[in-house]
Amino acid sequence: MDYNKNISGKYAGLMLFFFNVAYLLLLISTLMPYDLSKEILFISIGIMIFISSILTFVLKITEVDINIPNTITNCRLVLNIFIFTCILNIELNDSDKILLLVLLSLLLDGVDGYLSRYLNQSTEFGRVFDQEVDNFLIFILTFSLI
């Protein structure tokens, strides 16, 4: 299997946007099926649509290729949005579940960095995107202390 194939073209951002929606819905339905309120679902989707729209616009004007490490970073972005909405919802502020999600996000951070070096798919966009997703997680964790 050739892992050096990238998703390119003007539809890469749009495909990533729909991937975000599907991934978020899968995450919500898999991780916390019994505790979820409608507020979490709507807040998560709203934030994700806003951030994904910006990402789609950036990908369209810069014509950046999406590779495997960037896709994993994108998964971390959606996971971080879900963590943020779980922290915002006071009723679902279950620290054990949130801690597991944060650890999963940190694990994926290591995986995407390793894969970008191993597959030789490091890009300037990937470096900046990874750093911004890391900063978003730091913001979320700082916000949770308030």
Where are these regions (language model features)?
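Topogenic membrane-insertion module of multi-pass membrane proteins
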Residues: 1-99, 108
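Membrane-interfacial alpha-helical segments at the cytosolic side of multi-pass membrane proteins
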Residues: 81-89, 136-146
